[in-house]
Amino acid sequence: MISVGIVGGTGYTGVELLRILLRHPKAQVRVLTSRTEAGKPVADMFPNLRGHTDLQFSDLNIDALKECDVVFFATPHGVAMQHAKDLIAAGTKVIDLAADFRLQNLEQFEKWYGMEHACPDVLKDSVYGLTELNREKIKQAQVIGNPGCYPTTVQLGLAPLLKSAQALIETKNIIIDAKSGVSGAGRKASLGMIYSENADNFKAYGVAGHRHHPEIVEALENIAGKKDVFEGLLFVPHLVPMIRGMLSTIYVDLTEAGKQTDLQALYENFYANEKFVDVMPANSSPETRSVRGANELRIALYKPQPNKLIILAAQDNLVKGASGQAVQNMNLMFGFNEDEGLQGIGLLP
């Protein structure tokens, strides 16, 4: 049994981590911090956890966190990097659900997140936690940068094409049209997230530039093993009036080799042994409700024209897009079965 700390337990990803870890047979949450709710029983804030835990929120105490085997940071950007060096020096592993360890390019990080990185030496040795694509590195990691929710759908949606020995798609004109529920914006109060602003409404945001764009580009370059080939990539996220769920629609142009390839078979073979990636039959329509509460991502392919491919990827943004994938990474880091604590089935209807 490993001991776990969660920094930032009152946000959506923090409480989702707790919900998942309370069912984990080999992990016990011992520290759960909050800047504003120290001393309050968790079940008083989240009644779904009544009868499942007697934990109370506490102030952040670095010495208490050092006693844990692993610490998750479900915090705003910039928090994990302030504490990562002290924790790993004490032998504690770190999994950050914010962006502190996602981008290896410091210039891009500072541009998009508006802060100087506090520990570039730790960043250099950290591992990007897209589980299905970085499994062996994750097993050896001390610090994990958990991927963003949108980048998870994009990478898993495109990886079979980019990993192929042949160039199957034109990489300079990829279009990603992505939609997310409002929980992706976090739990803090803001005008744009209140009910009357989102109910009966559907809008694009971050059209001029979104923080996940450089993460997507850097990650795709690493998958493809090529630099500067995704300059023309377009990424537009949208907010839909639901709490959980994410659907990315990815449009690509096929090369001559791509036109001749059985792309359905390519995807099915690529993900044949993956427990959390479901390749649906061709021309299916993955629904967000089918993965609600589950650590699964469903993919479907359409080929509307000989030289066009549409990839649909659906996930729960709080689970496979955040906390579930973080626990998946924890399992690898400690030699557990990858699906420990993650066998939950999506809630439908």
Curated annotation (Swiss-Prot):
The keyword Zinc-finger does not apply. SMART domains: Semialdhyde_dh (SM00859). Its EC number is 1.2.1.38. InterPro entries: AGPR_AS (IPR023013), AGPR_type-1 (IPR000706), NAD(P)-bd_dom_sf (IPR036291), NAGSA_dehydrogenase (IPR050085), Semialdehyde_DH_NAD-bd (IPR000534). Pathway: Amino-acid biosynthesis; L-arginine biosynthesis; N(2)-acetyl-L-ornithine from L-glutamate: step 3/4. It catalyses: N-acetyl-L-glutamate 5-semialdehyde + phosphate + NADP(+) = N-acetyl-L-glutamyl 5-phosphate + NADPH + H(+). This is N-acetyl-gamma-glutamyl-phosphate reductase. It comes from Acinetobacter baumannii (strain ATCC 17978 / DSM 105126 / CIP 53.77 / LMG 1025 / NCDC KC755 / 5377). The gene is argC.
